[in-house]
């Protein structure tokens, strides 16, 4: 049990740059994944230079790197559910599905909302993994908003500071809106009110 917690949480302890470098090593043209494909007499795949694959792997690496943190939040929520509630459901002969949908998920909802909002905020702010894995390419396949701000304001020959500042402001407003939504959902759930 402790081993699996460690396995899930370990990537959170690593720097996003280190995580991206490990995955870049695995996914590069001469990397481990292609070596396995070649050993099975398959054609190697350009994981990071094909737009579709690069987009998928960028998202996967970002999610994988933070999954342990989200799992920890959900595990804390599960452990906070009183055992008496499950015992009462067992005495009432509630099916496992009914126990899940009527007890576990409703009591876990505040934690699920926090995880959802944190994951959305992290998804919007992803930069390190993209910068190390693909640099925003191929083309603009993995250019997310923070990468766009960086490229527009600092990396290009012509620095478009106004456009980068406008994109930064839009990002800040979006993140504030997500945070306010999370607060509203959490407070409405705690008060037992219906969210409008």
Locate predicted features.
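A structural signal for multi-pass alpha-helical bundles of membrane permease subunits
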Residues: 1-196
């Amino acid at each position: 049990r402790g081993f699996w917690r460690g396995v899930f949480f370990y990537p959170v302890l690593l720097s996003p740059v280190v995580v991206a470098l490990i995955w870049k090593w695995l996914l590069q043209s001469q990397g481990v994944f292609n070596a396995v494909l070649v050993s099975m007499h398959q054609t190697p795949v350009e994981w990071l230079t094909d737009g579709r694959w690069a987009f998928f792997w960028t998202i996967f690496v970002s999610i994988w790197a933070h999954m342990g943190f989200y799992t920890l939040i959900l595990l804390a929520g599960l452990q906070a559910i009183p055992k008496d509630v499950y015992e009462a459901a067992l005495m009432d002969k509630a099916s496992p599905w009914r126990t899940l949908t009527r007890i576990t998920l409703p009591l876990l909802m505040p934690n699920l909302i926090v995880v959802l909002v944190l994951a959305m905020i992290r998804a919007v702010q992803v930069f390190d993994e993209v910068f190390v894995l693909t640099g925003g390419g191929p083309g603009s396949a993995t250019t997310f908003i923070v990468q766009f701000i960086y490229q527009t304001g600092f990396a290009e020959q012509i620095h478009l500071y106004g456009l980068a500042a406008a994109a930064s402001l839009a990002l800040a407003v979006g993140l504030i809106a997500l945070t306010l939504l999370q607060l509203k959902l959490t407070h409405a759930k705690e008060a037992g009110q219906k969210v409008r």
